């Protein structure tokens, strides 16, 4: 890289992610603006909404075309993630999980679409908003399933039967994990993966553009080949990151819903009386 820099090669700069404002509008103390990152985020949201609206506006008993695609996506999220992770009660959260998966996937895939070539999720603001919505939702699910008192009580005292010093140690860990670490890691994981992947793709793409016209051409060809391979790999990462954030969201919702449920200990199960007519030897 230093040799290339001395010869005039310029790698990715901060302007790649700090896209210039197309226009600014000041309303009092509020400054509204539109740039490439914001436009792509709005496009992704509208694209997802329009696709599902077109797919279900004239639903038929035997789905075809776009309706078949939308129903397949819904069934996948509902069966594999909502019910598979949360349980039967997870169906009520399927619409949110479906929209989350679809929106993140489109935002990610825009990184390799000509004309866009920018993943909106590589701006930390987008993953932070998604994590905030998930944060509110899984806490709401926990409060609705268990009640506010039991939900926060177990968060403060997750092991009531443990010795006092363990309870004191676990309380801040549980509170930090639920209220701070989960939304933070959810946002940073998506942001960091998309940011790093886009930087890597840009380095080899710009390298190929710089080296191809110059002999020896083998270096330019190698850089171009790596860029093509990374583009294909980026598509896999795009889908994988959308899946990961969706399944983690489902796991957080499911964990919050069972928060505070009492599990029967083996000793309690053995101590319970056997049903009438069952021999004592059959209790074990």
Curated annotation (Swiss-Prot):
Signal peptide: none annotated. It is a multi-pass membrane protein. GO terms for molecular function: proton-transporting ATP synthase activity, rotational mechanism. Belongs to the ATPase A chain family. F-type ATPases have 2 components, CF(1) - the catalytic core - and CF(0) - the membrane proton channel. CF(1) has five subunits: alpha(3), beta(3), gamma(1), delta(1), epsilon(1). CF(0) has three main subunits: a(1), b(2) and c(9-12). The alpha and beta chains form an alternating ring which encloses part of the gamma chain. CF(1) is attached to CF(0) by a central stalk formed by the gamma and epsilon chains, while a peripheral stalk is formed by the delta and b chains. NCBIfam families: ATP_synt_6_or_A (TIGR01131). This is ATP synthase subunit a. It comes from Frankia casuarinae (strain DSM 45818 / CECT 9043 / HFP020203 / CcI3). The gene is atpB.
């Amino acid at each position: 890289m230093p040799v290339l820099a001395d010869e005039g090669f310029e790698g990715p700069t901060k302007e790649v992610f700090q896209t210039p404002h197309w226009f600014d509008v000041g309303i009092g103390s509020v400054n509204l603006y539109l740039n490439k990152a914001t436009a792509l985020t709005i496009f992704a949201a509208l694209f997802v909404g329009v696709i599902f609206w077109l797919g279900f506006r004239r639903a038929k008993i035997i789905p075809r075309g776009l309706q078949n695609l939308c129903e397949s996506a819904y069934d996948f999220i509902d069966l594999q993630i909502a019910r598979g992770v949360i349980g039967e009660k997870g169906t009520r959260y399927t619409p949110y999980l479906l929209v989350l998966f679809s929106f993140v996937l489109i935002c990610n895939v825009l990184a390799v679409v000509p004309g866009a070539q920018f993943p909106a999720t590589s701006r930390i603001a987008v993953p932070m908003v998604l994590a905030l919505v998930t944060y509110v939702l899984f806490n709401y699910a926990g409060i609705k399933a268990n009640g506010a008192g039991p939900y926060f009580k177990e968060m403060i005292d997750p092991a009531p039967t443990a010795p006092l010093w363990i309870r004191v140690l676990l309380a801040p860990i549980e509170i930090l994990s639920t209220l701070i670490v989960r939304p933070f890691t959810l946002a940073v994981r998506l942001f960091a993966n998309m940011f790093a992947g886009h930087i890597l793709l840009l380095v080899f793409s710009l390298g190929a553009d710089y080296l191809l016209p110059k002999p020896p051409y083998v270096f330019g060809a190698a850089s171009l080949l790596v860029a093509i391979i990374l583009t294909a790999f980026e598509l896999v990462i795009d889908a994988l990151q959308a899946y990961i954030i969706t399944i983690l969201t489902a796991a957080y919702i499911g964990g919050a819903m069972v928060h505070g449920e009492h599990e029967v200990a083996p000793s309690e199960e053995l101590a319970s009386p056997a049903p009438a007519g069952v021999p004592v030897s059959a209790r074990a």
